[in-house]
């Protein structure tokens, strides 16, 4: 077990038991398994309150006292997930890793995620111990087994990691940092095709300290985080491995917090992953993982395990977790620093937004108009042709097709499509045919007409559009419905919610950079209105107006600085605090603004995921986002989707829709990740 560095604070959740008596513990375990049935409570209580070193002593004493193998007895007495968890705790860490890897490459198929997790996250010392343990336990060479079971660049990088030769000195050469940034840039972004060997050499061998500086410089030089380049240049398991290496270089604890969250979210629990991480990190960095988990996911690791597991299995995992954490939203001092640094980085990043639908290269509006007319003439409709044409043309090209269709046939293409198509496919195709501002105007009109208002649609559109987009929507709304958007919002909403929407609908957000002094003042207003400031400098209603004005009119770069100052000032995250302190539509619109400022593609990825998860699909939201973002940032949304939900947007759509609607959505989605 790797020990903390000299003077470093111990961050594990399991410690040496103070009055340790291995002989007595061996006897307790023997009695717990004697006779009919076993005392699982006694077993889990004892094993989770001893360190791994102490458990090895218990194993030896058990063999001396009873001539039996303790692990074999535990395997015989226990079953299922509980047995895997307890037996995992009883193995020395290197042997536990060796067993996981053996299982990952045995039988049909390979568990690449397990290989990636272990080899990307372990230190040199842990890798050397793992290689020796594998040889000892299975009388086989680990490198030979892995090379026999994997291929390509993925295999090459695994072999590099298996050497355990990452540099470990903290002295960093600025010249070498610059050279590595240049080499990575030339190997990927500047090259036709990718020089994977450079990525493998630099990411597989340089020290963590050195690589953190390389990543910072790469962002400053290229305007892209290294992760974005890896996603753009690499693919498959090799891409996943390199992203895992980067995450572990940045923060191993954050990498494991993400893995744990993904293991428990959604339907079904990935128990193997959950067990492996809880066992392997319990004496290393479980406290750090817990801090980051709460910061990122607004809930404690403890509460998620509690809600997602049951029985003795749950009790054992909770013991390894080591305790529940305070209310969501508040940062530990260390986590506040991480969040602060994240905002510093995001201020430098120039994320390149990319849509998935681009203008067709060999565009011929005349041929397209004729093909569409043919697809709708006579009996039946050729939906495939309609989808192939409309989903693969830009919006500007579709407007040309509409015009050409009218010139050729004296008919309105929209009216023909409306009469020939139906249901979800009709809504999707007609949406694609409308100019973006008119489409948004229609969605806002639909959200306000009839009984009840679709507040979610109003929020989604008004909280995320740019000034130019909002002004175009206002013009389109007036043109199409002979009424101003502001009047429509006024008559359909009320109170603070109405004021916020009308403010957003003016399209009057500042477009400059940040002002640090003003950002501190704005953060103070936010702290006062959210009732976590020590002092208050005004009455509640004027503070509410100022808070609304800050969120609705300040520029995105400035608001990022405000959120950063808010963390610095309060140790809270503004989004979590709004969720906790506010309610109803006002809370929802403020949260949407904050999320959009933080990461707009991620905001839409979350909305798409929610539109398809659980029973039933929210086709309206799914259609609206796919249509409205297809030429703006749908490629970025796809990347955020797979990063957060561990499955591609393509897979989610495929699993949740069908028929021609599915085909059209996948065409807009633009590919599998």
Swiss-Prot record:
A pair of annexin repeats may form one binding site for calcium and phospholipid. PANTHER family: ANNEXIN (PTHR10502), ANNEXIN A6 (PTHR10502:SF19). The modification Phosphotyrosine is found at residues 30, 201. One of its GO terms (molecular function) is calcium-dependent protein binding. May associate with CD21. May regulate the release of Ca(2+) from intracellular stores. The modification Phosphoserine is found at residues 13, 422, 537. It comes from Bos taurus. Keywords: Acetylation, Annexin, Calcium, Calcium/phospholipid-binding, Cytoplasm, Phosphoprotein, Repeat. Seems to bind one calcium ion with high affinity. One of its GO terms (biological process) is regulation of muscle contraction. This is Annexin A6. It holds the Pfam family Annexin. Its main location: cytoplasm.
């Amino acid at each position: 077990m790797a020990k903390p560095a000299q003077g470093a604070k111990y961050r594990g959740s399991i410690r040496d038991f103070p009055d340790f008596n291995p002989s007595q513990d061996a006897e307790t375990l023997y009695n717990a398994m004697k006779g009919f049935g076993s005392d699982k409570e006694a077993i889990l209580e004892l094993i989770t309150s001893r360190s791994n070193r102490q458990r090895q002593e218990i194993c030896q004493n058990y063999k001396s006292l009873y001539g039996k193998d303790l692990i074999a007895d535990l395997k015989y007495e226990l079953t299922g997930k509980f047995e895997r968890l307890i037996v995992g705790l009883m193995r020395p860490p290197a042997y536990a890793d060796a067993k996981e890897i053996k299982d990952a490459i045995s039988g049909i198929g390979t568990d690449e995620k397990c290989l990636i997790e272990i080899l990307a996250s372990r230190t040199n010392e842990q890798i050397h111990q793992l290689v020796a343990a594998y040889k000892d336990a299975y009388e086989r060479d680990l490198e030979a087994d892995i090379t026999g079971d994997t291929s390509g660049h993925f295999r090459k990088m695994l072999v590099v990691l298996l050497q355990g030769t990452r540099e470990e000195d903290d002295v960093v050469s600025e010249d070498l940092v610059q050279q590595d940034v240049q080499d990575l840039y030339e190997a990927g972004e500047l090259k036709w095709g990718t020089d994977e060997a450079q990525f493998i050499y630099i990411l597989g061998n340089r020290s963590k300290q050195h690589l953190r500086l390389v990543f910072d410089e790469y962002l400053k030089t290229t305007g892209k985080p290294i992760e974005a380049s890896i996603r753009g240049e690499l693919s498959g398991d090799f891409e996943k491995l390199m992203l895992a290496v980067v995450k572990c270089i940045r923060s191993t604890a954050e990498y494991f917090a993400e893995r744990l969250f993904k293991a428990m979210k959604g339907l079904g629990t990935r128990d193997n992953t959950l067990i492996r991480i809880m066992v392997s990190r319990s004496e290393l960095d479980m406290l750090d993982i817990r801090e980051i988990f709460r910061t990122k996911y607004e809930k404690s690791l403890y509460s998620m395990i509690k809600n997602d597991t049951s029985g003795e299995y749950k009790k054992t995992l909770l013991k390894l977790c080591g305790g529940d954490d305070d209310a969501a939203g508040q940062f530990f001092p260390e986590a506040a620093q991480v969040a602060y640094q994240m905002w510093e980085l995001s201020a430098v990043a120039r994320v390149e937004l990319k849509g998935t639908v681009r203008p067709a290269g060999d565009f011929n509006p005349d041929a397209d108009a004729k093909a569409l007319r043919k697809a709708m003439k006579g009996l039946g409709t050729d939906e495939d042709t309609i989808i192939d044409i409309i989903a693969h043309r830009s919006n500007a090209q579709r407007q040309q097709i509409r015009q050409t269709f009218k010139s050729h046939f004296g008919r309105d293409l929209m009216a023909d499509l409306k009469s020939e198509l139906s249901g979800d496919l009709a809504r999707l195709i007609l949406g694609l045919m409308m100019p973006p501002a008119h489409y948004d105007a229609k969605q806002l009109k639909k959200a306000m007409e009839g009984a009840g208002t679709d507040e979610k649609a109003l929020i989604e559109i008004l909280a995320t559009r740019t000034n130019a987009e909002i002004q175009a929507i206002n013009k389109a709304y007036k043109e199409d419905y002979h009424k101003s958007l502001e009047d429509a919002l006024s008559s359909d909403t009320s109170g603070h919610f109405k004021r916020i929407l009308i403010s957003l609908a003016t399209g009057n957000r500042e477009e400059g950079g940040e002002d640090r002094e003003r950002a501190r003042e704005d953060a103070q207003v936010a702290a006062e209105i959210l009732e976590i400031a020590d002092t208050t400098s005004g009455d509640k209603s004027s503070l509410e107006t100022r808070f609304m004005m800050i969120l609705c009119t300040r520029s995105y770069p400035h608001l990022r600085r405000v959120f950063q100052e808010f963390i610095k000032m309060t140790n809270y995250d503004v989004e979590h605090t709004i969720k906790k302190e506010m309610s109803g539509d006002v809370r929802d619109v403020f949260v949407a603004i904050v999320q959009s400022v933080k990461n707009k593609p991620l905001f839409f990825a979350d909305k798409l995921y929610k539109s398809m998860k659980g029973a039933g699909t929210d086709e309206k939201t799914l259609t609206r986002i796919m249509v409205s973002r297809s030429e703006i940032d749908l490629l970025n949304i796809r990347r955020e989707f797979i990063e957060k939900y561990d499955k591609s947007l393509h897979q989610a759509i495929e699993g949740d829709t069908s028929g021609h609607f599915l085909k059209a959505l996948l065409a807009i989605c633009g590919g599998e990740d």
